Amino acid sequence: MLRDGKNEGMSTIPGFNQIQFEGFCRFIDQGLTEELYKFPKIEDTDQEIEFQLFVETYQLVEPLIKERDAVYESLTYSSELYVSAGLIWKTGRDMQEQTIFFGNIPLMNSLGTSIVNGIYRIVINQVLQSPGIYYRSELDHNGISVYTGTIISDWGGRSELEIDRKARIWARVSRKQKISILVLSSAMGSNLREILENVCYPEIFLSFLTDKEKKKIGSKENAILEFYQQFACVGGDPVFSESLCKELQKKFFQQRCELGRIGRRNMNRRLNLDISQNNTFLLPRDILAAADHLIGMKFGMGTLDDMNHLKNKRIRSVADLLQDQFGLALVRLENVVRGTICGALRHKLIPTPQNLVTSTPLTTTYESFFGLHPLSQVLDRTNPLTQIVHGRKLSYLGPGGLTGRTASFRIRDIHPSHYGRICPIDTSEGINVGLIGSLAIHARIGRWGSLESPFYEISERSKGARMLYLSPGKDEYYMVAAGNSLALNQGIQEEQVVPARYRQEFLTIAWEQVHLRSIFSFQYFSIGASLIPFIEHNDANRALMSSNMQRQAVPLSRSEKCIVGTGLERQAAIDSGALAIAEHEGKIIYTDTDKILLSGNGNTLSIPLVIYQRSNKNTCMHQKPQVQRGKCIKKGQILAHGAATVGGELALGKNVLVAYMPWEGYNFEDAVLISERLVYEDIYTSFHIRKYEIKTHVTSQGPERVTNEIPHLEAHLLRNLDKNGIVMLGSWVETGDILVGKLTPQMVKESSYAPEDRLLRAILGIQVSTSKETCLKLPIGGRGRVIDVRWIQKRGGSSYNPEMIRVYISQKREIKVGDKVAGRHGNKGIISKILPRQDMPYLQDGRPVDMVFNPLGVPPRMNVGQIFECSLGLAGGLLDRHYRIAPFDERYEQEASRKLVFSELYEAGKQTANPWVFEPEYPGKSRIFDGRTGDPFEQPVIIGKPYILKLIHQVDDKIHGRSSGHYALVTQQPLRGRAKQGGQRVGEMEVWALEGFGVAHILQEMLTYKSDHIRARQEVLGTTIIGGTIPNPQDAPESFRLLVRELRSLALELNHFFVSEKNFQINRKEA
């Protein structure tokens, strides 16, 4: 929370999860009621019985289970919905009223997420084109401007109005078909006289009114038939009927003419209409007014619309998505109730409201939505920052939106209306760049689905601060002072001339002309970009990489908060939910690793802590108590720190001593040289938890059994199993060990037994095992300590809900060669070598550096902010200070960042009596020495303490080797991929490279022994064991045989022949 003395309320940053909470609360408070009111009264075919809902008395019950239990048992954290319903007999005027169970609605927890089947899921906000009308101009093949007006419905359907060279207006209802606007207006219910009375240019409409057109619009029925014929592309003469009208209503009017409340508001504002907001359908009056504006465009009146402007977009929030799904569930329930009433009367049964309603439609609709909808995603829980940022994403993709392959560059680009609403930096990389953005820290969603940004109003009459939230279209009418002018300090005399924005242009104006100013210098950035210190000195592409890489940082076993930050670290940690915070004041009466007992107001509150919990990225989420027994605490005080948090602040990495210099080529191309101190002192050690699970089913031959008596397996592999056949807690397991012993029964014929088995059965009566071993084994690359075993029993004894056993294994990973590290300025690299600390370059006080970066990685990438952070971090480490600097500090004075860094370095050198910290000849640099020889390097080197992160891309998850494994059935070549223990493909270009070097024997091995020559690869193993020479393959490999078979399928016979060396006879041999 950032405050200014005068304007405390204005300077408070809103909660980062607020957008999710507000959306869900709006759904519970308004969306449920709106959809329930739409539920119709249902009558039977004889209209004797009527079913209706009494919406005023619906209630949501408190969940029966806790969040932790839902995660543990793979259940949904939901609330039961109960609604009063009545059944009315019209003949006797009797009514039976009951409170019925409608189904379960998943609830949102304190993190802004939902727990569905034990998995944390989050709903992403979607950016859609706002319903309404938009005017555009395009050039035809002759270079002449063609003006069109596009009407977009609430469903996303589009209809176009266009005007040709002869000033005739057409309505295009499909890509190929277009009809006269007179026909469309007549089909919607207007006659010719009403049309001419409601337009501004009746003479233009009369100019293309031919006798043929008059016949088409002579009556409403003729207009509907003409419209249907053009819309449905139907030949002949269709006959007017009720079914034809219903088809038009369903296919055209419902999908393309329903504007909704937002569309009606936009249509009224764009066309200057005064139609009621409750009238949400497209009217003939709208069509005629749109045609008038289109004619005005043709003659140079009016302005065209920018489709990419945020005022023409709307946010489809969590509330809208959940409300749409609830409405869909009610439609399904309506069909069920209608069918049940008819069925009950047909069988002469007396229905009750309880019997008519089933909870299946609502429950299954939400389960399928959270599990299958593209905007419902599994919560990324790599670190606390990732959890917050994921809920603040804005996606142009999804149902009704764009696709990554068809979106143009203009849509992906930054727009001036994004200022203060969508971060211009934080977006995904790759095919979805510009299509998935992030919400700015101060932005909020308005009433009409628009993104609003706060501004500080400058008023001469009142000296008090007043903050305005403006939608995208409104701030263009004000002179808005840019972010480099002072926004907080009211006592400083303002500059006479300031840069400002006005109508998407940047101007330089006098201070007296400014209407609005920014709240903060980083109010237009997302959370990820706002955590980058000195971001103003970086190229935007590198800042984008940094925003993404901070979300990939692994929580370390010993976290450390950054020396140089921006001030948002504390709020990011608090809003992430990683910390345990006191909800009431009181006294600590007990602390333990798994809970804290707080006594206050006569009650004792138990606060559970997270103990070694696995995230979906296999990182470790853990909380450590920070309070002692007997201490009195206040509301809001931190009780326990979580993963990647220290002192209530976000702590994703470590402050390490870094030198920017080349070292024997080991930091070539962004490689990083590190000291062994980072390994032995567990500086970058992290814990990772993997989950392995197995289910027990009931087969046709009988149930599967979990047991520790597994035949034909070595006792060494079963050493960790308990008497139930499940691995014991605390066991150390290696690759190939049995985690859960399981036997599956199978049908075995008498003839398939081995002779010795049949002999044992005949003589001794010993039953031979007929079960197949289907144990859960630890796969390749897995090793560690078993920290948890969960045996989830099936509920209700149903065979369709099998038992599930989950084993959680913790793995300790030190930093090693091949791991990826990164700074906060897009400077990333791979560990290339780990040097002994005595060989690392050392400073003038004898301290060896921890990392060596390549200095050539800074100038071409233009991320100079890392140099400022590096030098300021060195000063902070020597002075034991932490700096929190807001970006764009040059608004105070020129070269403010450089002056701050140099002054702190000078003070650090003065207080610690180390003059080498700041040397005026080369400030920020220092003479350092080679650890191998003790000689100083030729040039002074930049040294410092930047904040370096260890990323999730680790070599243990990627390194792979294959000696033997599975082969594809058709080609007999090794499979592909690490998960399948696959091989590496030697393709066409690799063969060319080997041919170019003339390595014939290596090439033959690659194409035969190591690939798809079945007999040759079987002989290799034996000859390798006995030390013999590998025999040359005598026949063709399997890939050549496959080619021959494919040619035979095309009726082409291919054979090869051998010519005898003795008599030169040709011997034919089958391929």
Curated annotation (Swiss-Prot):
What protein am I looking at? DNA-directed RNA polymerase subunit beta
List the InterPro entries. Answer: DNA-dir_RNA_pol_bsu_ext_1_sf, DNA-dir_RNA_pol_su2, DNA-dir_RNAP_su2_dom, DNA-dir_RNAP_su2_hyb_sf, RNA_pol_bsu_bac, RNA_pol_bsu_CS, RNA_pol_Rpb2_2, RNA_pol_Rpb2_2_sf
By its UniProt entry, which NCBIfam families does this protein fall under?
PRK00405.1
The reaction(s) catalysed by this protein are:
RNA(n) + a ribonucleoside 5'-triphosphate = RNA(n+1) + diphosphate
Please name the GO terms of the biological process aspect recorded for this protein, alphabetically. Answer: DNA-templated transcription
Query: One GO CC term of this entry?
Result: chloroplast
What is the native source organism of this protein?
A: Panax ginseng
Its EC number is 2.7.7.6
Give the family this protein belongs to, as stated in its UniProt record.
Belongs to the RNA polymerase beta chain family.
- Keywords on record: Chloroplast, DNA-directed RNA polymerase, Nucleotidyltransferase, Plastid, Transcription, Transferase
**One MF term in the entry's GO annotations:** DNA-directed RNA polymerase activity
Compartment(s) of residence: Plastid, Chloroplast
Q: Which CDD domains match?
A: RNA_pol_B_RPB2
The domain of life for this entry's organism is: Eukaryota
Task: Output the HAMAP family linked to this UniProt entry.
Answer: RNApol_bact_RpoB (MF_01321)
Q: Which EC main class describes this enzyme?
A: transferase
Q: What does this protein do?
A: DNA-dependent RNA polymerase catalyzes the transcription of DNA into RNA using the four ribonucleoside triphosphates as substrates.
Q: Quaternary arrangement and interactors, per the entry?
A: In plastids the minimal PEP RNA polymerase catalytic core is composed of four subunits: alpha, beta, beta', and beta''. When a (nuclear-encoded) sigma factor is associated with the core the holoenzyme is formed, which can initiate transcription.
Does Transcription appear among the keywords?
A: yes
